[in-house]
């Protein structure tokens, strides 16, 4: 049984509730479901007051959102999803509010997403910064900062943590049927044990605004420099180490291009901070790591096809490498960048503008559904290289996959258009926001024109 009592307080006739009868609603009715201490105040007045305050809070929050005219409704909806996925006490943002909704029928790719992935930090903070919600940005950055500050100098970052920062997330299979009978139903996530070395660069990039953005800068940031130096040393220590990568392969370690990209980006962030504080030791190490990461990335370049591959010594392609352009590793105007996009399009894009993460078999076979954030990365990349009309067209096509409430899951079946995976998925909505802002920058449309 439950540790505390669950109680329903309502002014609906109790026999209707107890006997689950259908009845005609001809006046407002109120229901309060409580766990533990029951509602003791007057029902109607209390709930009307709660509703009025709640509506006012969310309307004011939306009014404070920085947003252009490009698909404003969709961006606002995604911003609300992002806000609702944040745990106010610590600032953690979970990947999704559900567990074990399958990525595709019969795939057994059923995961518990009710945790905070460090990897998502860069994308989430970028979206919050664009939306102008600095309180949420600071809360999330401080969550990451608190995890980092409590780690030992040589301790590894995990890919994910609980909303309170707990590290042990043991995966268990529950004796439940699952959504549409799709088993297994998992609680916990084994990925917390994975080696995913891109997280160090992600943390450095994510903490950068706390040092350089004048709207966010706090005094006495110098005391965090030893922590940043420890993280930079972790980049150095893991530079040549194979890992599970962005897609969390369970039985396959490689030297992933995506990891090198964030080693490169994280070292750039550290160099900016070092220059601010005239920390020559940190700057020297950052410069060395930028060079090493670039050299490793170039080992992933397939000269014959003109594309960067998923990892060193593989021909497999990966949609995450669209970000070589959006993160300015490649010059968006260069022939190399444009050819790289074309090859990824040819192999991973569907005719609907959806994108597979990759097409090769993994621990569970070949992927059957497309990954929504990859499609939004593609839109962002198109805007970046100047193919703005195509970016707009595909963005608008992606909006058609939302449900009647404007919500997106993790995956879409390209053949049927059905949504799969945990829902709603913060990653997908972050992708929507960042893609919309990338297009808006290119359009530069004034509201009065």
Identify the meaning behind each predicted range:
Residues 1-449:
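Acidic, mature catalytic/reactive cores of soluble proteins
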């Amino acid at each position: 049984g439950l540790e505390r009592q669950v109680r329903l307080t309502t002014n609906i006739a109790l026999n209707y509730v107890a006997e689950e009868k259908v009845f005609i609603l001809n006046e407002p009715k109120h229901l309060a479901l409580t766990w533990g201490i029951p509602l003791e105040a007057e029902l109607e007045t209390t709930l009307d007051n709660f509703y009025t305050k709640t509506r006012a809070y969310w309307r004011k929050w939306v009014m404070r959102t920085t947003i252009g005219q490009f698909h404003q409704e969709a961006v606002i909806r995604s911003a609300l999803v992002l806000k609702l996925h944040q745990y106010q006490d610590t600032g953690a943002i979970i990947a999704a509010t559900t567990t074990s909704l399958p990525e595709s029928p019969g795939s057994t790719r059923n995961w518990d997403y009710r945790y905070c992935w460090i990897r998502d930090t860069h994308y989430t903070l970028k979206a919050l910064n664009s939306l102008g919600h600095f309180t949420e940005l600071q809360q999330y950055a401080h969550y990451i900062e608190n995890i980092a500050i409590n780690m030992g100098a040589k301790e590894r970052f995990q890919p994910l943590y609980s909303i309170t920062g707990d590290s042990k997330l043991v995966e268990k299979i529950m004796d439940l049927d699952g959504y549409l009978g799709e088993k297994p139903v998992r609680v916990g996530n084994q990925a917390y044990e994975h080696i995913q070395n891109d997280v160090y660069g992600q943390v450095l990039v994510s903490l950068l605004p706390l040092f350089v953005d004048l709207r966010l800068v706090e005094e006495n940031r110098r005391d965090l420099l030893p922590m940043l130096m420890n993280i930079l040393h972790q980049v150095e220590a893991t530079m040549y180490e194979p890992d599970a990568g962005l897609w969390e392969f369970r039985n396959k370690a490689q030297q992933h291009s995506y990891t090198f990209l964030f080693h490169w980006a994280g070292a750039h962030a550290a160099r900016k901070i070092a220059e601010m504080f005239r920390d020559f030791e940190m700057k020297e190490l950052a410069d060395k790591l930028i060079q090493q990461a670039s050299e490793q990335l170039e080992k992933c370049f397939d000269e014959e096809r003109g594309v960067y591959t998923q990892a060193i010594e593989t021909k497999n392609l990966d949609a995450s490498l669209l970000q070589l352009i959006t993160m300015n590793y490649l010059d968006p105007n260069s022939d190399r960048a444009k050819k790289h996009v074309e090859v990824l399009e040819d192999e991973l894009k569907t005719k609907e503008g959806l994108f597979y993460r990759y097409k090769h078999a993994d621990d569970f076979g070949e992927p059957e559904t497309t990954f929504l954030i990859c499609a939004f990365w593609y839109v962002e990349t198109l805007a970046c290289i100047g193919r703005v009309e195509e970016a707009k067209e595909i963005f608008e096509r992606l909006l058609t996959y939302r449900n009647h409430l404007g919500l997106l899951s993790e995956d879409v079946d390209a053949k049927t258009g059905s949504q799969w995976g945990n829902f709603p998925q913060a990653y997908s909505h972050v992708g929507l926001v960042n893609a919309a802002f990338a297009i808006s920058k290119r359009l530069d449309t004034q509201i009065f024109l």
